[in-house]
Regions:
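Cofactor-binding loop segments of dinucleotide-utilizing enzymes, especially the Rossmann-like FAD-
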Residues: 8, 53-54, 109, 136, ...
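Short beta-strand-to-turn element immediately C-terminal to the catalytic PLP-Schiff-base lysine
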Residues: 145-147
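Short alpha-helical oligomerization interface
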Residues: 19-23
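Conserved N-terminal catalytic core of the sugar/cofactor nucleotidyltransferase
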Residues: 2-5, 13, 27, 31-108, ...
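Catalytic-core segments of class I nucleotidyltransferases/pyrophosphorylases
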Residues: 46, 104-105, 112, 118-125, ...
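A short, conserved acidic/glycine-rich loop-to-beta-strand motif
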Residues: 127-137
Length: 245
């Protein structure tokens, strides 16, 4: 399996730490977020990874050249910040070069978790979904809506009102963890261009009948480390990230 680490963001929530470094190089207990994520992916047997970069991209490239993670790591440099969907579409070549239907993992660099990625992958393969999202039942301003079959059917709007793309009477709000398994056939269905969120693509395709599935992972540790508060919490929660994250 191959993977993409989304690391191109400006890291505005982590300022001033990201004034002089990309957020992927922010450290927890002496280890960069990028190292933690790469090590975790490798522990699940992933050895081919592409990382997108924009803010201070040269520093990220230098870092990867100076550290050997025992993996093939490509960098997708974005002159313009493309958001999650645009960034993935730009990196499509990396997944297409396999010439197979092998699904791939997409993982935000600014989340730490103990989510079982093998379980997520297995669920994806068995369900036949176009994408499978790790989700939790927690409060967030950006909840997605899933029907009784745990298939995407909408999202909460800025005023906390449901915005449904499928005619569902029963739905539940769940928080996306920034970790998902995707089938490469999604690239042929990506009509969006330029800067766009992968959630925009998911919602459009769900409205067309594509199966965008959820796997609840409430029993696993998860932490957003894209804020100073989250970073501090993670630092206190872990004494050995190599065994926990």
């Amino acid at each position: 399996m191959r993977a993409m680490i989304l690391a191109a963001g400006l890291g505005t929530r982590l300022r001033p730490l990201t004034h002089d470094r990309p957020k992927a190089l922010v450290e927890i207990n002496g280890r960069t977020l990028l190292e933690i994520t790469l090590t975790r992916l490798r522990s699940f047997g992933i050895h081919d990874v592409i990382v997108n970069a924009h803010h201070l991209a040269g520093m990220l490239v230098d870092y990867l050249q100076q550290h050997d993670f025992g993996m093939r790591i490509e960098v997708s440099r974005e002159d313009e910040l493309l958001d999650t969907g645009g960034g993935l579409k730009k990196a499509a070549w990396f997944f297409r070069e396999q010439g197979t239907d092998e699904p791939f993992l997409v993982h935000n660099v600014d989340v730490l978790s103990a989510i079982d990625l093998q379980r997520l992958t297995r669920q994806h393969r068995e369900s036949g979904a176009l994408a499978t999202l790790a989700v939790q039942r927690r409060d967030t301003s950006r909840q997605l809506l899933f029907d009784t079959r745990l298939e995407l059917c909408g999202r909460k709007t800025g005023d906390n009102e449901p915005e449904l793309v499928c005619p569902e009477e029963a739905f539940q709000p769940l928080a996306f963890c920034g970790i998902h398994i995707i089938s490469p056939r999604i690239f042929a269905r990506m009509s969006e261009e330029g800067v766009f969120s992968i959630i925009t693509t998911y919602l459009r395709l769900a409205a067309l009948g594509e199966k965008i599935a959820a796997l609840p992972v409430d029993e696993y540790y998860w932490r957003d480390v894209g804020t100073p508060e989250g970073l501090a919490e993670a630092t206190n929660e872990f004494t050995d990230l190599s065994s926990s994250a």
